[in-house]
Amino acid sequence: MKNLVLDNRFVHELPGDPNPSPDVRQVHGACYSRVMPTPVSAPHLIAWSPEVAALLGFDESDVRSPEFAAVFAGNALMPGMEPYAACYGGHQFGNWAGQLGDGRAITLGEAVTTRGDGHTGRWELQLKGAGPTPYSRHADGRAVLRSSIREFLCSEAMHHLGVPTTRALCLVGTGEKVVRDMFYDGRPKAEPGAVVCRVAPSFIRFGNFEIFTSRGDEALLTRLVDFTIARDFPELGGEPATRRAEWFCKVCERTARMIAQWMRVGFVHGVMNTDNMSILGLTIDYGPYGWIDNFDPGWTPNTTDAGGKRYRFGNQPHIAHWNLLQLANALYPVFGAAEPLHEGLDLYARVFDEENRRMLAAKLGFEAFGDEDATLVETLHALLTRAEVDMTIFFRGLASLDLEAPSIDPLRDAFYSAEKAAVAEPEMNSWLAAYTKRTKQERTPGDQRRVRMNAVNPRFVLRNYLAQEAIDAAEQGEYALVSELLDVMRHPYDEQPGRERFAARRPDWARNRAGCSMLSCSS
């Protein structure tokens, strides 16, 4: 198997925990703790991403070698790997939670890659489920196959949808059982274990900065800020104050663009705590996430959030801004002034508004989003919610609407209830007439309009029930559906004849099934 070129700047340039013990503890004055992955009994490759493997320089023979499974299950290290778990805190459901840290994620190192054109990349390789760390609290540091499949598939599905995200190299089974109480209801059971190798330029989170501010460690906070800028934002220069202000604006801008993309494809993160917010504006930590089936701005897949629905679909833009405010509060001791932080927060609002308008225009096939279009969108969203209409199928079908004879007929497959469709039909036809009138103002040829809309409205998304079907099969040792689902999600905007079933709306059996309509943080 090919070796990687590793340049582990995080552990070389920032202070680490001098205590080598993996015992759970509060870690002070350090950005990380060195820790070894815990070996497993029978590592075996379940699935892998060809694109991420190629990004790192691995070919298929590398990936299918026993050495590959051993390394990415945590049983062996490649030359130059220096495993560690990061120290961070976070606000969880709006409240400060103190030290959290990588409780079952272990970073192996930073791989440096060079493309044929000379462009270099830096990729942190992180194992999720590789055993206990000083930050594991009361947990075992392991992950179950169920949650690992969901993380692996969604990481790659989001990338191919065009949403900023961490990636996934591979999914490796451990041959061991992990005990989990899926809904914390006193009914634990043993489930198959697995390890996912996550890949990103950086796994630094908002919480990495918050922990040092909460402890009054301004010196280490400053070091981490300047390190992050130097490694992850090398294009920024100038005096420290200027560079830091530009950096915070970049973080706010990237976060805004990410959230707009979530809203475009109907993704609900489910647990937008500040420790789950990437400093690079990447979607990170795929836990109790879900995809909008029937359009509902008030829906959240996370049972832990079922009461307050803090992280519901329609509230995600607001929560991202709130999280950036917590980051701004954490950074204030370094900045020493509120103005550049306020500028970043204001920038988030402006960029999100611009990106959201651009996204809405694209989904509807408009060149630009005018102020008069807001009413059209508000009316549509209210109608989709009341009539229980599938978001993905509706917008995909809208591209094929006959503008000379607009009718609800080609959109009927998007309705979950025939009764609600019948009730909504007059109002829907009225909206379609208004939409047709607005669309004709564009003077865009029908074929061109269809191609443009189909490039932003996916045919395939990782619906919760599809992931659950793959999980059910994998738990019986059948992994073919995981691989097929990955392949489908690699081409979400293509028609893919013969794979229509992967574009079907949620079946009735999945409406209230665990893993399909409701999920927990148990993993």
UniProtKB/Swiss-Prot annotation:
Class of this enzyme: transferase
In terms of Pfam families, this protein maps to: SelO
Protein residues bound to ATP: G101, G103, R104, K128, D140, G141, R198, R205, D285
- Protein keywords: ATP-binding, Magnesium, Manganese, Metal-binding, Nucleotide-binding, Nucleotidyltransferase, Transferase
Enzyme Commission (EC) number: 2.7.7.-, 2.7.7.108
What is the active site of this protein?
A: D275 (proton acceptor)
Q: Which PANTHER family match?
A: PROTEIN ADENYLYLTRANSFERASE SELO, MITOCHONDRIAL
HAMAP family according to UniProt = YdiU_SelO
- What does the UniProt record say this protein does? Nucleotidyltransferase involved in the post-translational modification of proteins. It can catalyze the addition of adenosine monophosphate (AMP) or uridine monophosphate (UMP) to a protein, resulting in modifications known as AMPylation and UMPylation.
The record's comment on protein family reads: Belongs to the SELO family.
The name this protein goes by in its record: Protein nucleotidyltransferase YdiU
Q: Which organism is it from?
A: Aromatoleum aromaticum (strain DSM 19018 / LMG 30748 / EbN1)
Query: Source organism lineage?
Result: Bacteria, Pseudomonadati, Pseudomonadota, Betaproteobacteria, Rhodocyclales
Q: Write the gene name.
A: ydiU
